Amino acid sequence: EDNYLFKDFNLEIEESSFVSIIGMNGSGKSTLAKILIGLYKAEGYITIDGYLLNEQFIKKIRRIFSVCFANSETHFIGETVRDDLVFSLENLGYFYDEMTTLIDIISKKFKLENILDKEPSLLTESEKTKVAIASSLIHSPKILLLDETINKLTDTDKKLVFKLLKEYQKEKKLTIILITHNLEETLFSDRIIVLENGKIIKDETKEEIYKNDYLERKGFELPFVVKLSQNLILYDLLDKVYFSENEVMNKLWP
């Protein structure tokens, strides 16, 4: 029992929320991800959209719960990007006409049209990551888990991906679980959970957690716009923390 990383661990994530899970190395972030997808067994129980995570419901869970890991190479098994998108859908029982339509839609959203017939090995790291995320979303799952996935994207692709994730959250009620060590990525989430040695030491809205220097005292590097906002609050130039530079500029020079 003393070897358990997680003890008396309870976590509930609301439907269509965007939750960031952060923590230093060894905090349990990636272990939690592996537990959530059934790679590690856990005592107690895990339910996903009302289904117990076990052999009986694993097929149903795979349809509603998509996962994208840091190593995008694990998503590629076909000779082309198109092959891999087809494989994602074939696995879930889609017919040819449905697959063609869904691939067309997702490739336009993620700007993949020019690389659909490329070999995955010829893609940049950012392109590979973008394809992996697109592949995870192509069948419109209810839940998407991103485990240290975003950091390989270029700044341009990050903006596109986060824009699309927010659209999926709003329009398709997608629940997003983002595991990251980069606090810049948490600016798009609604709720931030801090892990330390397998325990939740903080669980607050983005607005609450960035009100003070708690995360900085814990050794995290705050996002630039948060640090800027906090400094401007000290001089009574802002009334609260803002999460985009445009918002800060508009408040300072309306």
For the regions a language model picked out, list residue spans one by one.
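The feature captures the beta-strand-to-loop junction immediately N-terminal to the Walker
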Residues: 22-24
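Helix-to-loop junction immediately C-terminal to a conserved catalytic motif
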Residues: 37
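Conserved ABC transporter NBD signature motif
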Residues: 44-53, 61-62
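Conserved ABC ATPase "signature" region
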Residues: 97-115
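Conserved ABC ATPase signature
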Residues: 119-123, 127
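Catalytic Walker B motif of ABC-type/P-loop ATPase nucleotide-binding domains
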Residues: 144-148
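Conserved ABC ATPase "signature" C-loop
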Residues: 197-198
